[in-house]
């Protein structure tokens, strides 16, 4: 028998059977940061980007990606997501601004939604980059992380680098 949960007795990949797990309310919140130049920040706020406002498009991309996570990540189970919400805020940093993208995904199910939240913020960041690259190709997508998760057999998790959120 394989010592790894995602490999069968022949050593080949398999999807774990979650049918015996209890359905519970679960949430996951992820975050991704995109470092941008002052020039790009100004262009966004002056609404002078040729492609238009990047945030609504990034928001839709994040929601769509959360729903398609099982198609992107081989061992993720397709799940019926109850909700996905994204947030965007700019923070001033040395030499520019940081766009902080957050995503919270909820489900009542027998597996968690951590990967869905992480996929949502990643897709939103990539879409933001695509919408803005004509002005600033030096953007840096950085620090993608799971901020918190609630529910499930293993209980709640709060990333040690973030304050505990209620």
Swiss-Prot record:
The name this protein goes by in its record: Cyclic pyranopterin monophosphate synthase
| Self-association state and partner proteins as the record states | Homohexamer; trimer of dimers.
**Catalytic activities:** (8S)-3',8-cyclo-7,8-dihydroguanosine 5'-triphosphate = cyclic pyranopterin phosphate + diphosphate
Task: List, from the UniProt record, the residues annotated as the active site of this protein.
Answer: 130
Write one Gene Ontology MF term.
cyclic pyranopterin monophosphate synthase activity
Q: Which PANTHER family match?
A: MOLYBDOPTERIN COFACTOR SYNTHESIS PROTEIN A (PTHR22960)
Biological process (GO), any one: Mo-molybdopterin cofactor biosynthetic process
Entry superkingdom: Bacteria
> Which organism is this protein's natural source?
Shouchella clausii (strain KSM-K16) (Alkalihalobacillus clausii)
User: Would I find Protease among this entry's keywords?
Assistant: no
Could you say which residues bind substrate here? 75-77, 115-116
Which key words are in the record?
Lyase, Molybdenum cofactor biosynthesis
Protein family according to the UniProt entry: Belongs to the MoaC family.
Pathway in which this enzyme or protein is active: Cofactor biosynthesis; molybdopterin biosynthesis
The EC category is: lyase
Please state the Enzyme Commission number of this protein. Answer: 4.6.1.17
Q: What is its biological role?
A: Catalyzes the conversion of (8S)-3',8-cyclo-7,8-dihydroguanosine 5'-triphosphate to cyclic pyranopterin monophosphate (cPMP).
Q: Name one Pfam family in it.
A: MoaC
